[in-house]
Amino acid sequence: MSYSRSHQFFERARKVIPGGVNSPVRAFKAVGRQPLFIERAEGCTLVDADGNRYIDYVGSWGPMIVGHSHPKVVEAICDAAARGTSFGAPTALEIELAEQVCAAFPNMESVRMVSSGTEATMSAIRLARGVTGRDKILKFEGCYHGHADSLLVDAGSGVATFGIPASPGVPADFARHTLTAPYNDLGRVRALVEEHKADLAAIILEPIAGNMGCVPPQPGFLEGLRALCDQHEILLIIDEVMTGFRVSYGGAQQLYGVRGDLVCLGKVIGGGLPVGAFGGRQDIMRHLAPDGGVYQAGTLSGNPLAMSAGIATLKLIREEGVYEQLEQRSAYLAEGLRQAAAAAGVPACLQRVGSMFCNYFQTGPVTSFADAKASDTEAFARYFGQMLDNGVHLAPSQFEAGFVSLAHTVEDIDRTVEAAHRSLKAI
């Protein structure tokens, strides 16, 4: 494959955009390549600036559950744009999407729309502190909750990709309010809660850790967190930005039967447009301005294009058989990739929950960030490059999840597995 036009665009971009990209992982530094510049996408296919075509398992980092450029979603966006792109005033679209979100998540009696997952988690943390009158939060090593200062501590994902334990520019006074524990280590959480319970406002976590690959909760972990929070009047914030509407219509909370006091959403609910949301019980949400004293605002919050795309997407994934299809196709892909690794004699551990997956270059299992970091990132980088050259677009980091969409066919998956056989033998 030729990548000459993408390389030319990258050189232009580096002159006017820091690092040539607007989000660090897109730079492909962790895999020793230069980034692709995408021209268009349809279904599960990306087409880059050189005309190369790829089967896509990034899905814009998760939102594209129905595939790229779905006609119903595009139609909804175009119809909304024809009426106006932004008003700075309420619309009925905001109510409609909020009603659908609250119906999907019974513990979300009220929801506030924002423009990104970072805004959602940042605002939920502020609300938790305002409601409890406490300052500290507890998060988990390898869980990423956006790039707000207090959450860039042992944050996984892009931070792990570049080997940076925490970002410069985060004041020590901010970081000292953030406690961290190993994911799936309930004993360590109990010890931290016992020591800091008088100052602890919230525990925040990804219910399936998708920013260290794909790490599900061990049996009893979520239930134990829920019990600790109830016992000590700490708010449990479940960050479903990645898992919401992805692993089931009601997210990981429906899948595992554990509910948060506050929930953060994003990705799928915007249908590929910038959106986030956070919500919870009425007695908590009433503390938000204008009813309460906890301030949160946004110029483009509830943007009509994003609301329309979200409404159209949720309608599509409510159709009968959607999640059964996602499960069947994802299981078929996972088994094929496992067989390809075994045939090539390459140590690999494929972990999957629903249509989220990660192929770790190690024997596994992976239950924590420490486990994830034991992966052979050099082998992954070679595999990534081979798969790209064979027409398969994976996330350019060992520490990111991959995603299957409704647009992936059995034929697409067969081609992917064939590419994996060739790629794994080559590395």
Swiss-Prot record:
- Compartments (UniProt record): Cytoplasm
Tell me which domain of life the UniProt entry assigns to the organism this sequence originates from. Bacteria
- Is Zinc found in the keyword set? no
Write down the InterPro entries for this protein, in alphabetical order. Answer: 4pyrrol_synth_GluAld_NH2Trfase (IPR004639), Aminotrans_3 (IPR005814), Aminotrans_3_PPA_site (IPR049704), PyrdxlP-dep_Trfase (IPR015424), PyrdxlP-dep_Trfase_major (IPR015421), PyrdxlP-dep_Trfase_small (IPR015422)
SUPFAM superfamilies given in the database record: PLP-dependent transferases
Functional pathway = Porphyrin-containing compound metabolism; protoporphyrin-IX biosynthesis; 5-aminolevulinate from L-glutamyl-tRNA(Glu): step 2/2
- E.C. number: 5.4.3.8
Recorded catalytic reaction(s): these are: (S)-4-amino-5-oxopentanoate = 5-aminolevulinate
One GO cellular-component annotation of the UniProt record comes to:
cytoplasm
Check the record and name the Pfam families matching this protein: Aminotran_3 (PF00202)
Keywords, ordered alphabetically: Cytoplasm, Isomerase, Porphyrin biosynthesis, Pyridoxal phosphate
Q: What class of enzyme is it?
A: isomerase
Among its keywords, does the record have Isomerase?
Answer: yes
UniProt-listed CDD domains: OAT_like
Cofactor(s), names only, from the UniProt record: pyridoxal 5'-phosphate
Gene Ontology molecular function terms on file: glutamate-1-semialdehyde 2,1-aminomutase activity; pyridoxal phosphate binding; transaminase activity
The alphabetized list of GO BP terms reads: protoporphyrinogen IX biosynthetic process
Residues bearing N6-(pyridoxal phosphate)lysine?
Answer: 267
- Which PANTHER family did the record assign? GLUTAMATE-1-SEMIALDEHYDE 2,1-AMINOMUTASE, GLUTAMATE-1-SEMIALDEHYDE 2,1-AMINOMUTASE 1, CHLOROPLASTIC-RELATED
Record-stated family: Belongs to the class-III pyridoxal-phosphate-dependent aminotransferase family. HemL subfamily.
Q: How does it assemble?
A: Homodimer.
Name recorded for this polypeptide: Glutamate-1-semialdehyde 2,1-aminomutase
Query: What species is this protein from?
Result: Syntrophotalea carbinolica (strain DSM 2380 / NBRC 103641 / GraBd1) (Pelobacter carbinolicus)
